[in-house]
Every structure is written in C-alpha cells, then in structure tokens.
Amino acid sequence: MNNNYLGISAIVFGTICFSVNDISVKLFSSEMPLNQLMFFRAIFAISILLFVILPFYGGFKYLNTNNPTFHIFRGLAVVGANTFFFISIAELSLAEATAIFFIAPILITIFAMFFLQEKVGIRRGLACLIGFLGMLLIIKPGTISFELISIFPLIAALFYTALHIITRKYGSQEKPLTMGFYIQVCFLVTSLMFAGGFYLADIDAEQSNALTFLTGSWVSVSTFDMFHILVGIALPISIGGILVSYAYKNYEASFLAPFEYGALV
C-alpha cells in the first residue's frame, strides 16, 4: 500500500472510532458525570492496551519513554479537547457541536504552516475548505444560535489542534501505542482530580445540563452500562488513539487534516 494511503486510512478509521466514542458519550451525558465516565473509559482502555495489544509488541518495555514532558502536554491537550467538547454536547445537539468543532482541520492546516513550517499549497487549502463545507452538508446542523456553550467546541478544536501539532513536532521518536497509553493515564489521573475537586466544591448545577455533566456526583453503574463503556467508548478510543497518533507522527499535519472529514462519509 502506498505510504500516503496508509496515513489516510489511519486518520479516517481513527476519526470514525472517535465518532463512535462521541455518540456513546452523548448517550451517557444525562446519566453519568463526565469524570466518572472518563475514569471507567481510562481503566478499560489501559487494560485493553496492556493485556490485549501490548503483548504483541514485546511487553511492558515497549512503554519506555525518554520524553515524559511530551506525554504530559499531549495528555493535557486531549483532556482539554475532550472536556470542552463533551460538556458542549450535554447542551447542544451532536450535529451542532460537531459543526463547530470541525473547524479543527482548518486550524491544523494553518498552525502547521507557522509552527511546523509545512508548505500548504492551494490544493491542501481547498481540500480543507471543501471538506468543511461537505461536512456541513452531511450533518445539516441548521442555524446555530450563539450561546456561551457554543464556544466550547471551538475551544475543544484549539486543544485538538495543539495535540496534533505537538505530536508532529516532538513525537518522531515515540511509538503510537506508547502515546495512546500515556494519554489514558492522564485521563485516569485528571478524572480522579476533577471528581475530588467537584465533590469538595459541592457545586449546585441543577439549572445546567452541561454543568451537571461536568460536576455531578458519581452514580451506581449497571453491568450493561459497563459493557457499553467498554465496547462503545474504551475500545474505539484505544484503537482510534493509536491510529491517529501513528498518522500525525509520520505524515505532515496539513496533508492529513482534510481527511479528518472522511469519518462523516
């Protein structure tokens, strides 16, 4: 397979996995607080990576890294992107939030020019623009009235852009599986920090679905819910994270960005 096709396939299938994750999180947004959902997702994803995928790569030594700072900043970028996007879909429809968030490929292309010194020609620029317009035609978000919550997917897009610029600029020596593993470790740690902080703050969030989703108290979880988190959230995010990390590590960000829209086809 042509190397470019390999990168395109990785980014398209990776973003499809992310879409499955987003739909599942939307379904849980009225039932379980975000930090609890991210905690279980991280536990399951780490287990999948450690005990299902990692043995094929030589075991725990494969997780060795000489650049922990790189993984911390990537982890914070992903946590930021996920948090702001998932808060937004507690209030907005998934179509509306996605329409705003999918400014990200255009941002990635622009940032790649300035921070990675990538040459972005007319074809790549047009590909991004056509992809964005095509996305609007597919999901038909309608008229998005301006509300404060509408800014959140845009903030998520900025964090998502930062993630891939960091990966492309500093991740050449890191393995995709390693990057995926440490992202889930960041989710595990931050979910517990958020849970503890919100518990101590005792925030009254009854008037806002988004605030309730962000700060709510943990709830009991059924076996079916755990299975749904495993299959609909943890498994897709584990596979998608590895695929997208591989793509942005090995291919120019401005080349890949338009293909982020491919998940919508």
Positions of the model-derived regions?
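C-terminal transmembrane-helix exit sites in multi-pass transporters
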Residues: A104-L126, A263-V265
